Amino acid sequence: MLAIAALVVVVAATFAVARPGEAPPAAADALQAKALGELRVFTGWLDRFGAEGYIGEVGWPDDARGDGSEWNRLASMWYDEADRARLWVTAWATGSLFGSTYRLNLYDHDGRGLVPSTQAVVVERAAPRGVHRGVAVAGGEFGTQAPSFSNEFPGTYGADYRFDPPETFSYLARRGHRLVRLPFRWERIQPQLGAPLDPLELGRLRSAVAGARAAGLSVVLDLHNFGAYRTPGGPLRLGAEISAETFADTWRLLAEAMKDTPGIVGYGLMNEPTHVQAGQAGTPERAWELASQAAVTAIRSTGERRLVMVGGYPWSSVHDWPSHHPRPWITDPRRNLRYEAHHYWDRDHSGTYPATYDDELAAAERR
């Protein structure tokens, strides 16, 4: 841990952060230029239409391969750019169920408490006034890799999945965070489509929100389902087996259940709706636009006024956002909406980072 702490200090001391009003620093290499250019695709789209944005996920590797300072230098420039665009950001990720080998884990749980990874020095930097910064606290969406996972076999709470305890949120607040994104699964919160929500799972979600709020954190609830709902017979997909009306009704129930729960700043309609099908809409993009509009309308019908985050088909990626959604598509009577994009800097934008910084740089130079 001493080596990690030393690296954090060195990296923090060497970053040159542009203050508001200053010109952005020029990219020093091709990978920095590529990442910043991709982010500007999304922020340019927002600017063109007067829309507001939220980066629900951004993540990069730790120093396990000895290149943490290079990744952090890119990250610092990326956050400068996000600050100038006044983007809300939750970095990916932390959570007590992550193993110590997960290279995007921002805070390791070492058995005695949480320990910052090398990325934390960038993520913890102060945001401009009125801009929310924080992290995703994963765990509520875990346990879905087993072939048997479904609405009928959702896993065991505390073993296969769980929300982090209040101590995690208190620690994050002490580190300067003000926002957390809480993923959860549709199959657990609503074990049968069109049926009431599960009161036990609702209670767990409310308890997690209460723990975050007690620490002074605001919460974005994140339905982490990729545009599908798992059953023993296979996935049901939005646009095909699941109608926009069914999806909207789920969000009506969620908004009714949570609208009096303090601490929630917004609702994330669907994490990376990549499994959405075209159906009668003609294209999966249009099917998602119709489903997400129906969900926003349903949420507002309950009297809920809080923010709604709307991702883009298929992976909510910044670099190709306009090619899937040339224009904003949501009409919100409350005008309290942010379009949610994600950004990973490896060449396939998967966030798996199998290559080193130097390898990714070489790939960027060949573009």
Regions found by a protein language model. Name each.
Residues 64-130:
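Aromatic-rich peripheral "rim/lid" segments of glycoside hydrolase catalytic domains that contact
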Residues 53, 89, 219-221:
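Hydrophobic beta-strand scaffold residues
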Residues 153, 157-179, 184, 190, ...:
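An active-site-proximal structural segment forming one wall of the substrate-binding cleft
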Residues 87, 133, 178-180, 265, ...:
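Short acidic/polar active-site loop segments enriched in Thr and Asp
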Residues 22-85, 107-108, 153, 157, ...:
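Extracellular glycoside hydrolase catalytic/binding regions
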Residues 1-18:
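Secretory targeting and sorting signals
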Residues 15-21, 25-28, 34-45, 109-179:
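N-terminal carbohydrate-binding accessory modules
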Residues 59-63, 94-99, 138-143, 179, ...:
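Solvent-exposed loop/turn segments at secondary-structure junctions
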